[in-house]
Regions:
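N-terminal-proximal low-complexity accessory segments that begin disordered
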Residues: 1-34, 38-84, 96, 100
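Extended non-core architectural segments that shape protein topology and connectivity
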Residues: 91-94, 103, 112
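Protruding loop/beta-arch "assembly-hinge" segments enriched in small, turn-prone residues
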Residues: 238, 244-249
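Long, basic N-terminal domains or extensions that often function
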Residues: 87, 93, 99-100, 119
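C-terminal anchoring/interaction modules
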Residues: 1-2, 29, 37-52, 66, ...
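Serine/threonine-rich low-complexity intrinsically disordered regions
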Residues: 173-178
Length: 471
């Protein structure tokens, strides 16, 4: 039964609209008192980061799109934000939970003492990183292991481990974010039980256990040597440990019951429509007969012998009770997954806007909570991007945005600004956004002396996602 697939598809379709609007997903806020200089700086950062995501990072939207479909199914995904030396630019890539190893007892990545990303590269891509100085070269007999077994997800999807691309052996790397003490490098002595280990990123090739890179994982000018973060957690529902819960965990049992009930109904209908049974050997002549609708065929048999010679098996019609059970299970799953159609369109057209908003919020409580988690995670992702831009951008760079030449300065990415998603954590759908803007506009029209009509209409246009409002 497609109940889980339907829930995942509808969630993905709603979430992608909120997290990646047409005008770009980033907006800025000013920390402290705003002046004209800060406002211009905030405008430059917002304009550039949206340009960066939409134009310079073509992988951002496909990865986000794919991640938002995986997330409701498995409950936990990750995004890795880093500077890719092979592309010489910033990137943010989707990392599946099965390629990320962390202790289930960890609270979050910031306090986790160790976590590991499993990276699979072709030998050619690995050599590109070597050429960029990111990894050490492997020996002729190191790396390039054949992957003989498909992963669980690949097995479900029907993807074979063997194919035309197996000639290009895969290099499997283990990128470990951990704390370590190197004798002769760190100030502390590893034999001292009170010594404090420092954060490092240590990468090794899985098959040969060869270390291919060691990098400090703190800012060079950071006196406290705090661990830097490169990964962002995205959770569907909080789990009992580190990993979150998805639809498979919560309503997977209902999905199995619905699938079993549907199959039983189909089997029952098939047997009832295509009956078989027993017939006495030799009592009715064999062979094939073509019978047209409304036609009677002559048989060489004694009258009343046909009924006595043939006995069909008593297959029952599909059970009404089983059909009711299927409906109950599907309704229960839909209520939890919040994919049932909202009854907003069926409401009275003359009902107050507040009633419409209440109906929307009541029907989307679960999605509202999930949307707040997505908003917080995406805000962290944008802050990591802002931090990397402050380190890797040139002092001044020109870029084309909205058909005009614009400029961004590396000094713009300072602590006087913060970047957050355009999405509102309290507004989880375009329907709710439009209803709220409509309520404001109606109140403004009823008491124009108490409201700024320009601002009321502007909010309505913004809720409708109309471009070029100022024109």
């Amino acid at each position: 039964h497609p109940i889980i697939a339907e829930a995942a598809t509808q969630f993905q379709a709603r979430a992608i609209q909120e997290l990646y609007p047409a005008g770009g997903p980033v907006r800025t806020i000013i920390i402290g008192e705003a002046d004209d200089e800060l406002k211009e700086q905030a405008s430059r950062v917002k304009e550039y980061m949206n340009y960066q995501i939409v134009e310079e990072m073509p992988e951002f939207f496909p990865d986000l799109d794919k991640m938002l479909f995986h997330l409701p199914l498995v409950g936990q995904t990750f995004k890795k934000v880093w500077y890719d030396p092979s592309m010489d630019r910033l990137t943010a890539r989707f990392v599946q939970a099965e390629d990320f190893v962390v202790s289930p007892d960890s609270t979050d990545l910031r306090t986790s003492p160790r976590y590991t990303q499993i990276i699979k590269l072709s030998r050619n891509d690995y050599n590109r990183f070597v050429k960029a100085g990111y990894y050490e070269p492997l020996g002729p007999n190191e790396g390039g292991a054949d992957i003989e077994e498909s992963s669980t997800v690949e097995s479900i999807e029907g993807i074979s481990a063997f194919g035309a691309e197996q000639d290009d052996k895969t290099v499997v790397l283990l990128e470990m974010h951990t704390y370590y003490m190197f004798d002769g490098i760190d100030d502390a002595d590893s034999s001292d039980i009170d010594a404090v280990a420092l954060p490092y990123v240590i990468t090794m090739e899985q098959e040969s256990q060869t270390v291919v890179s060691i990098r400090r994982n703190w800012h060079e000018d950071d006196e406290n040597q705090e661990k830097r973060e490169w990964f962002v957690e995205y959770k569907f529902l909080p789990g009992l440990g580190f990993y979150g819960f998805g639809l498979y965990h919560i309503i997977g049992g209902l999905g199995k019951v619905a699938t079993g009930s549907l199959r039983a109904l189909l089997d029952s209908a098939a047997f009832a429509n295509m009956q078989g049974g027993f017939k006495l050997k030799g009592r009715v002549p064999g062979g094939e007969m073509d019978i047209a609708p409304g036609e009677f065929i002559d048989l060489d048999a004694v009258v009343d012998d046909v009924k006595k010679a043939i006995m069909p098996l008593p297959f029952k019609e599909p059970s009404g009770t089983l059909f009711q059970l299927l409906g109950f299970v599907v309704d229960a799953a839909q209520r939890f997954a919040a994919i049932a159609d909202l009854n907003v369109g069926e409401a009275n057209n003359n009902a107050p806007v507040g009633t419409t908003i209440a109906l929307i919020e009541q029907g989307s409580r679960i999605f509202s909570a999930i949307h707040k988690r997505l908003h917080n995670s995406q805000a962290k992702e944008f802050r990591l991007m802002m931090e990397l831009d402050s380190l890797h951008l040139p002092d001044e760079m020109k870029f084309a945005s909205s058909g005009a030449a614009s400029v961004i300065y590396r000094a713009d990415f300072d602590d006087r600004l913060d970047v957050i998603p355009v999405s509102d954590p309290n507004v989880f759908s375009s329907t709710q956004r439009i209803a709220q803007a409509q309520a404001v506009l109606q109140m403004a029209q009823s008491a124009p002396e108490l409201h700024d009509m320009y601002e009321a209409y502007k909010r309505m246009y913004e809720a409708l996602r109309i471009q070029g409002i100022e024109e």
